[in-house]
Amino acid sequence: MTKPPNRNTRKRTDYTRRSKPAGTSDSGWIWGRHAVLAAVENSRREIRALHVTRNAARDLPADTPHTMSEPDVIDRLLPPSAVHQGFAAEVSAIKPDPVNSVIDPTHGLVLVLDQITDPHNVGAILRSAAAFGVRAVVMQDRKAPPLFGTVCKSAVGAAERVAHVRVTNIADTILEMRKAGRFAIGLAGEGESDLAAAIAGPDNQGYGPGLVLVMGSEEKGIRPRVREACDVLARIPMTDKVESLNVSNAAAISLYEAAKWRPARGEAP
């Protein structure tokens, strides 16, 4: 009698040893087709374990080490709510870019997230940031989710494609960027300026790659000291039928408004 094949047989030996156990601060799980495939292609990620179903394995780049697993095996590796589409990977954290990379006003549009902690929102914002050509997303080191799990699933691969910077003090970082010549616009419902007008500037020429957009959490908005660090507070014009937008939607609108100025100034779209 022929013994049936073990469908969970490891295809390579590369992942049989882990430098650190799963769940440590320098590693985490991601899932979903786009998130995992983008991580596999990202040289800044170390893939410590890669589990895929037989059908999902067809989408992997040739010679990618992986473990062939049944869907229920992958289910047990992940949180109960994870929709993995046959892909799951334990990966290293992406090393943040240095803060100096976003100070220079010629380096491109910067998006600052002030204590936005919801992983779905952060993931969706990263997706919009990739779509609209953001140079880097700045987050507070202890008040932002790590780039694993739901963040990466919601970002649909964009977490691997947008640079991110972690800082201790958001307000001080904004002031440092302004000192170097950047212009910082904070988004607030009570902002004194319309967003489009704020981005256009007083001479209607825009601020080009030196623009900084600052978003706050839905519950508290931008904190007082961060508000004070901005050049101006701006609002997205809305009817009185709703009080506010989801922060990821507000970020997408804001980034679209900023992106419209790049072709006008001869910058790469």
Language model: regions and residue ranges:
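Short, ordered loop/turn segments at secondary-structure junctions
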Residues: N55-A56, P71-V73, R142-A144, G189-E190, ...
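Short amphipathic alpha-helix with an adjacent loop that forms part of the alpha/beta core around
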Residues: V99-P105, E176-R178, L195-Y207
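RNA substrate-binding interface of SAM-dependent RNA methyltransferases
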Residues: P105-S193
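Active-site/ligand-binding-proximal alpha/beta "capping" segment
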Residues: I185-V242, N246
